[in-house]
Amino acid sequence: MGQPGLNRRQLLAAAGGLAVAGSFGFAALGTGADALASGADTRVRYWNLFSGGDGYNMIAMLDAFRKDNPDIAVKDSTLQWGSPFYTKLAMAAAGSRAPDLGVMHMGRVTGFSPGRLLDAWDVDLLAKYGVRQQDFNPQLWNRGVIDGELYAVPLDIHVQLCFYRRDVLKKAGLLGDDGRMVPVTSADEWFDVLKEAKAATKKGLQTFGFWHSDQNFQWWFFVAFYTQLGGTWFNDAGTEVTFDTDKATQVLEFLRRHITDGYADPNFGGGAGAEQFVNGSPFVWEGNWSVPVFDAAKVDYGATPLPPVFGKQATHAESHAFVLPHQADRGGPANEAAHQLAAYIVKDAQQWALGGHIPAYRPILSTAAYKKMTPQNEYVSAMDHQATEPKVWFAGSTGILAQDIGPIVVSSTTGSAKPDAAARRMKSELTRLLATKNPMDGRTAAQGGAVA
């Protein structure tokens, strides 16, 4: 594979702006003594974006790998989450300074110029270390396939969830005999549940928190419920917008109703929903990464996938995945060790599940240990009804699609725009994005081979 034909300005514009360029050197290279100082025969340079609890879990998994594979030294570097990470990874891949192994959100893979900034995985080498396609959810595995080649190996899916407090729901008569929230199958049932829960909620607390002014969360929730309605985005060729404004309006009206009916307080912004939940609010919609937070707070709670208010189960999902940043001379012991390390972590993701993520490697999900994990065992079904962003270059976590469309959803949810007008604006933005060229390679979605 030849050197990618991308210049510095294209990369910076694509991945997040010129402001991060000056910080490229130090964070990407990591700190401390070289990993080969341990006396190991092979070194693997590994970049990730995991901080907080995820960071601790990843370090524990890397230490386990080091103990089991003393001949392989892992030099890991943690970079800033979001656009800075993707900028540095792109620049490294284009400048012959790429690590042997990296992590990306699956939704960003299509836009990362597979074949130019990412190298394809050797599926036979992965199989040698126990990672095979049949051990993964087909939808999830195929998200990493571009033009017939595998460019991303899924580690997990992370999903948006409906967290609920058992103490409040028990008082409201909303717990079943199994101690879980009563099932909800329609929008009317959901608002009936909120009405009953509100009557049992302590004064001064909102009934429901859902990050109403946050563009990312509102976009994620929109994706989930639009998918429940069977909504589509583009045709398979990536040449036509198929976005349904009537269905979009229905979703936007549903989101807005949480505020107009008095269940979500518009004066509470940011992470106030989680704080109120800890203090006794009955519901909050949050990502599964909040599991360790609520565990630490000693809250008696459960968590389900987002309610199927439009009849079909679908919960917004993204995925952390392992990738091979482009190296002109990829191959040899370091490349094989990168395959071995990725396979080891994917198969050993029981530890990773402690952070709330659902392991992508399905054999883990059937183990007795995983089945005992709560509330993980309550929402594991989300693996089989993932609502994902369209497979286009401008999608994915912190991507252009969320940046451009998310604020429109917020404007409807918070009341500064009417839902039907917001839906039309969303379609207009989708039309513009579809015709826009990816700065990574100068191709539109139609030219980029977006269909797996």
Can you annotate each of these PLM segments?
Residues Q10-T31:
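N-terminal export signals
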Residues A40-S51, I72-S77, L101:
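Short, well-ordered beta-strand elements
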Residues L49, M61-L62, V109, W219-A224, ...:
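Extracytoplasmic/periplasmic substrate-binding proteins
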Residues A64-F136, K171-G173, E275-Q276, F283, ...:
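Extracytoplasmic "Venus flytrap"/periplasmic binding protein-like
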Residues M106-L161, G302-T304, K372, D384-H385, ...:
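Hinge/lid segment of periplasmic solute-binding proteins
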Residues Q139, T304-P305, G355-S411, T436-A452:
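Long, aromatic- and glycine/proline-rich binding clefts that accommodate carbohydrate-like moieties
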Residues D147-L155, Q160, S186-E240, F283:
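Extracytoplasmic/periplasmic solute-binding protein
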Residues F191-K198, D236-N267:
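Glycine-centered hinge/linker elements that transmit conformational signals in sensory
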